[in-house]
């Protein structure tokens, strides 16, 4: 696929309503929380009051209110980072994160790489610091957008327990976000509501923006569906044109949690985006790379020991990814089709049965993989993904392992950084040349200290 149609494609007609342009009939954005006490009622009243005020605010007022609200939520929910975290990640509350981000932005040179840039917000943290990590990344992105007019690639995550997603860190992550509130399925907690408001502003502050949520299981998927409902309440039906929510499960490749290998890889997300191409009215596919050039993958599919072995080999300096797909139950039905995995329970290693899905009507239910298989023969093909004008990608839940795996999300910077050379190139040299994983916060700190202070302005 090439970008020859980039200039000629029809732009979709999407009206994005901002904070001071909200439609009169959609200003009632009371958070949908069932109350059982005076405290709950007071909180709901506060939510409704804030939401009602937001529609009349200009941008500066909105950000000021956002700062106050984040601090109130932090105090109410007692969101504090785990005590065994590194000193530079120990903060007393959300307001400290906001001040830290503001100081960082005020003291940084205007980056040269934000022209029509899009963001990857890494909603990481699978311990008691999870909610704080979420607010940190969202607030930094909001601030960056406010000061520089574009979203950065920012991430921050830390797993104090060093446990896999099946362990207690997973449970505590759900608990923080209120996603295990089984007594009130489909209802938002006040913490979720604050996150929704922040993300909503991110989405609606861009002209014709795109936002994609990739989630890995039904619990977090419900949160994403709540986000969609929230968008409809706040901004009306036009929100449909700006958001694509992919509910889980995203296919779990064969993983070794003990070595923190596996998780989402670049090509796996690209497969989801291929599904978007067939589902959205503007028929666009969106690139997961910061380079203006095309990123090519030569993909080889073979069968080894009863499994499909998929290797993605870089062409013209791309990225190398290797994943192992589970054995297909009905491979004869999958030739060139999109499929959706069905899981039995949450246990790793369960057999996965792939069933066909219709990408033109069912693209909100993802885990989509386009599969071609011809017996045990080797098959090769090449796919490209054009870059978007702007957009925001939010990775939930699996991003911790995404960052620690051989392909971490900040490898998306690889082509841009390599083209600059010098200090910027050293940011990813450990991962690129030695295969050592870079934690997301390592890359963030390097970006703050090296990239944004002028190292990339050559």
From Swiss-Prot:
Region (Disordered): 1-27
Biased composition (Basic and acidic residues): 1-12
Superkingdom, taxonomy of origin: Viruses
Protein name: Putative non-structural protein 2
Provenance organism: Micromonas pusilla reovirus (isolate Netherlands/2005) (MpRV)
């Amino acid at each position: 696929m090439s970008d020859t149609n980039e200039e000629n494609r029809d732009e979709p007609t999407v009206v994005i309503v901002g904070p001071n342009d909200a439609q009169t009939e959609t200003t009632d954005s009371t958070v949908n929380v069932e109350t059982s006490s005076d405290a709950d009622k007071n909180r709901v009243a506060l939510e409704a009051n804030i939401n009602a005020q937001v529609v009349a605010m200009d941008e500066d007022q909105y950000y000021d209110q956002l700062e106050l609200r984040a601090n109130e939520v932090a105090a109410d929910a007692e969101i504090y980072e785990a005590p065994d975290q590194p000193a530079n990640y120990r903060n007393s509350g959300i307001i400290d994160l906001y001040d830290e981000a503001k100081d960082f932005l005020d003291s940084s040179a205007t980056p040269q790489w934000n022209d029509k840039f899009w963001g990857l917000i890494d909603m990481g943290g699978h311990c008691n610091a999870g909610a704080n990590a979420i607010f940190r990344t969202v607030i930094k992105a909001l601030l960056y957008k406010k000061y520089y007019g574009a979203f950065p690639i920012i991430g921050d995550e830390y797993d104090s327990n060093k446990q896999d997603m099946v362990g207690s860190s997973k449970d505590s992550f759900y608990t923080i976000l209120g996603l295990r509130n089984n007594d009130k399925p489909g209802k938002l907690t006040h913490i979720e509501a604050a996150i929704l408001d922040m993300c909503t502003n991110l989405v609606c502050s861009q002209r014709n923006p795109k936002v994609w949520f990739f989630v890995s299981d039904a619990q977090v998927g419900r949160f994403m569906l709540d986000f969609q409902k929230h968008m409809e309440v706040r901004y009306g039906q036009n929100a449909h044109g700006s958001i694509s929510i992919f509910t889980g499960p995203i296919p779990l490749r064969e993983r070794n949690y003990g070595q923190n290998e596996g998780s989402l890889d670049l090509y796996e997300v690209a497969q989801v985006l291929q599904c978007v191409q067939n589902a959205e009215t503007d028929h666009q596919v969106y690139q997961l790379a910061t380079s203006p050039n095309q990123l090519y993958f030569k993909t080889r599919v073979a069968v080894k020991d009863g499994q499909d072995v998929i290797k993605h080999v870089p062409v013209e300096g791309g990225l190398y990814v290797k994943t192992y797909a589970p054995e297909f139950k009905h491979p004869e039905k999958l030739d060139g089709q999109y499929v959706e995995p069905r899981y039995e329970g949450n246990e790793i290693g369960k057999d996965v049965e792939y069933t066909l899905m219709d990408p033109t009507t069912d693209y909100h239910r993802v885990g989509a993989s386009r599969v071609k298989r011809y017996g045990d023969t080797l098959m090769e093909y090449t796919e490209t993904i054009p870059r978007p004008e702007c957009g925001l990608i939010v990775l939930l839940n699996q991003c911790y392992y995404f960052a620690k795996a051989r392909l971490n999300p900040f490898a998306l910077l690889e082509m841009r950084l390599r083209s600059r050379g010098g200090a910027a190139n050293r940011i990813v040299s450990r991962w690129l040349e030695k295969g050592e994983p870079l934690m997301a916060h390592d890359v963030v700190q390097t970006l703050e200290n090296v990239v944004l202070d002028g190292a990339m302005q050559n």
